[in-house]
């Protein structure tokens, strides 16, 4: 139906794939990658890497941390993974769903980490990838500074809570202002 296809969090996006997964056992080392178009594209361009490692991609293009949080139970908790890799924030900064508020975005990321831990799911947090601007939202100002500030908070939270942190930003940035 129209409502299902256009639901804010797109909860049904992976419903068939989720239903087709066998029930996870304690021996399983199921890993879920939760993200946006970056994650979705990675799965699409490297399906063998995901399949051969037992990795499950749950990226939806254009989504923000608000939408990730709404679908976290469906696409992560209910699948009983051993580990979830959370990559969130790019589309928040791009204001894809609302005016950017770093505290809200950071809070959504923390909430996902807390939900995972409460369900005995290990967490890896990642940085937001570098961007100088967003071609679909050129009016957004100070993009590099906003990304760096959010990344600093995610990294500090990860360190304080002994959560592994993968710094994609550091590996990919060409210039701090780009």
Q: Predicted regions span which residues?
A:
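Serine-esterase "nucleophile elbow" of acetyl-processing enzymes
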Residues: 2-82
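Solvent-exposed loop/turn segments at secondary-structure junctions
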Residues: 37-41, 61-65, 90-94, 129-134, ...
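Conserved, well-ordered alpha-helix/loop/beta-strand core segments that scaffold catalytic motifs
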Residues: 85-89, 106-113, 117-126
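Charged helix-capping and loop-helix junction motifs
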Residues: 101-110, 144-150
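Catalytic His-Asp segment of secreted/periplasmic serine-dependent ester chemistry enzymes
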Residues: 129-178
């Amino acid at each position: 139906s129209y409502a299902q296809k256009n639901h804010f969090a797109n909860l049904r996006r992976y419903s068939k794939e989720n239903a087709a997964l066998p029930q996870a056992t304690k021996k399983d080392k199921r890993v879920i990658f939760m993200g946006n178009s970056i994650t979705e594209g990675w799965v699409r361009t490297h399906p063998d890497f995901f399949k051969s490692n037992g990795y499950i991609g749950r990226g939806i293009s254009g989504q923000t941390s608000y939408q990730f949080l709404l679908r976290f139970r469906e696409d992560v908790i209910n699948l009983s993974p051993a580990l979830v890799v959370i990559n969130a924030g790019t589309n928040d900064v791009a204001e894809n769903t609302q005016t950017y508020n770093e505290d809200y975005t950071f809070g959504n990321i923390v909430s996902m980490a807390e939900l995972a831990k409460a369900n005995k799911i290990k967490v890896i947090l990642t940085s937001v990838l570098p961007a100088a601007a967003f071609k679909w939202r050129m009016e957004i100002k100070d993009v590099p500074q906003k990304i760096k500030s959010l990344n600093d908070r995610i990294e500090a939270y990860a360190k304080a809570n002994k959560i592994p942190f993968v710094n994609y930003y550091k590996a990919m940035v060409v210039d701090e202002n780009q």
